[in-house]
Amino acid sequence: MAAEMDWDKTVGAAEDVRRIFEHIPAILVGLEGPDHRFVAVNAAYRGFSPLLDTVGQPAREVYPELEGQQIYEMLDRVYQTGEPQSGSEWRLQTDYDGSGVEERYFDFVVTPRRRADGSIEGVQLIVDDVTSRVRARQAAEARVEELSERYRNVRDSATVMQQALLAASVPVVPGADIAAEYLVAAEDTAAGGDWFDALALGDRLVLVVGDVVGHGVEAAAVMSQLRTALRMQISAGYTVVEALEAVDRFHKQVPGSKSATMCVGSLDFTSGEFQYCTAGHPPPLLVTADASARYVEPTGAGPLGSGTGFPVRSEVLNIGDAILFYTDGLIERPGRPLEASTAEFADLAASIASGSGGFVLDAPARPIDRLCSDTLELLLRSTGYNDDVTLLAMQRRAPTPPLHITLDATINAARTVRAQLREWLAEIGADHSDIADIVHAISEFVENAVEHGYATDVSKGIVVAAALAGDGNVRASVIDRGQWKDHRDGARGRGRGLAMAEALVSEARIMHGAGGTTATLTHRLSRPARFVTDTMVRRAAFQQTIDSEFVSLVESGRIVVRGDVDSTTAATLDRQIAVESRSGIAPVTIDLSAVTHLGSAGVGALAAACDRARKQGTECVLVAPPGSPAHHVLSLVQLPVVGADTEDIFAQE
């Protein structure tokens, strides 16, 4: 019988060991049993959670908000299997100190703790709070986003190539919300064989996910040809079966395309019928409105060249039901048996849909975006991934009713329309860039109706209407009952507004008649797909809290502007610029970062200020971050604009 260990001699005196454990600067935690009850914590942990009395408490009771963020699942695996686990820069949201839920990032190692007989009694964690490091990197990445397009394209050449071959966006349609994410496994295999598509065809929506055997440029070339061939067939109105049969015939002309797999589904907007074919591809995951998840039945079709034909099956999707298409990289993950991995995917998606899983802080407004992004991050961060991953998700929704506004033809009409139009466009799911473009164009139409159509204020003189069609296009109109009156030529800024409106949207027309003027626009809506090389990477998109009230703050050589700069406020800005710059003699910087709308009148004032500075040999610097409404408009009219902190970025680089 082995001699009992002399703990004092081998490990150290108990009091010394406890004191050393207490003063180690890393967070150390000991948990016991299947419920992971706290049995030991050191000073670093208590300093991190000073108000929580944890010893003796189960971890799930101490941090209930972590349920569904995959941390407890990891502790369970270590306790059950004895295999250590680790995480790098895991994002976790919970109440750490009794002050409310907050988001922090951690590196950690979880290892089993065994009894003398070898059985596992608990787990222990070594944890490092790396929140400051992650946020500093994220801030640097956000600043880099403000560099020139040339610099970004060089830095992200692999992603740019992927976006050139794949669908860069998904449509916005009245009967469904759509989201897509493409996760690149590694930089040197960025040109892979996965692809996705979403086609809005008026009465139906077609979703496609496919996978070509292999990686690299050859697989990407094959993928691109198959994607184009299938897209042409679907766009021509052929059924799912007919389109797949045509691509199966075509694949014989494309070396390397045999055994490519596809999953194609078609949603009828009216009935909710979802017809699909799994051509050698994993079946979609259906997450119902009540947050239950199941895989739909495979249809029995094989990959291209298999000769099995392309039978289809149907499901009826109710309002709130979501369907998730994916490639095998999502379920064939390192260290996970396929059966366990597919079950984990379904369970996680269901918990996120129910609200019990996933992240709660800064969550996307649309449930489908949260389902996509949280599923990828939480599913893959515990195992990693060694293949590209595509996730295309769609949730059926009730269509938003068309917009109809009747308002008085007054100088404030455009401001009233902008507020209601922004709200309606956000409700139908439009991206912020499309919202800015449409709001700008309609605002110009309304201002022209007031200025050119009526000599005085007219009650209910303007009608604005907008609707989203099943082909993904917004069609909007501004109608007045006045008689069009041209202004004299040569007036500063005249004629710029309608030209800007036409440039911002897909199509714009103005028709004058005896009964008034009708201005119409058609604009195709889309939302960008997300292309990343790391589930933790979240590109900084321009985010702006809408406060359209015009405010300008003037300090030495600098004017900071917030809100809408339109025909009613541009004159104020023009005067402030003239005074601060002494009519162009003194240099001036105009910060437009918080501008919510920059109309043609505002552009005219800024153009005049730049022209005065040029003639006087001084500078008028316009500042607006890329993605902001002001940056978008100024780039369109080719007025020089710089992003915030651009000079500091170049100095750092």
From Swiss-Prot:
Mutagenesis or variant effect for residue 444 to A: Strong decrease in ATPase activity. Abolishes autophosphorylation
Keywords carried by this UniProt record: ATP-binding, Hydrolase, Kinase, Magnesium, Manganese, Metal-binding, Nucleotide-binding, Phosphoprotein, Protein phosphatase, Serine/threonine-protein kinase, Transferase
Cofactor(s) listed: Mn(2+); Mg(2+)
GO MF annotation terms: alkaline phosphatase activity; ATP binding; identical protein binding; magnesium ion binding; manganese ion binding; phosphatase activity; protein serine/threonine kinase activity; protein serine/threonine phosphatase activity
Residue positions binding Mn(2+) 1: 211, 328, 387
Location of the STAS domain: 546-653
Domain PPM-type phosphatase residues, every copy: 177-396
Region feature Anti-sigma factor kinase region, mapped onto this chain: 397-544
Temperature dependence: Optimum temperature is 37 degrees Celsius for phosphatase activity.
Processing after translation: Autophosphorylated. Phosphorylated by PknD on multiple threonine and serine residues. Phosphorylation is antagonized by the phosphatase activity.
Cofactor note: Binds 2 manganese or magnesium ions per subunit.
Keyword Ion transport: no
Residues of the PAC domain: 86-142
Note from the entry: Overexpression switch off espA induction under osmotic stress.
Cited function: Primarily acts as an independent SigF regulator that is sensitive to the osmosensory signal, mediating the cross talk of PknD with the SigF regulon. Possesses both phosphatase and kinase activities. The kinase domain functions as a classic anti-sigma factor-like kinase to phosphorylate the anti-anti-sigma factor domain at the canonical regulatory site, and the phosphatase domain antagonizes this activity.
Entry protein name: Multidomain regulatory protein Rv1364c
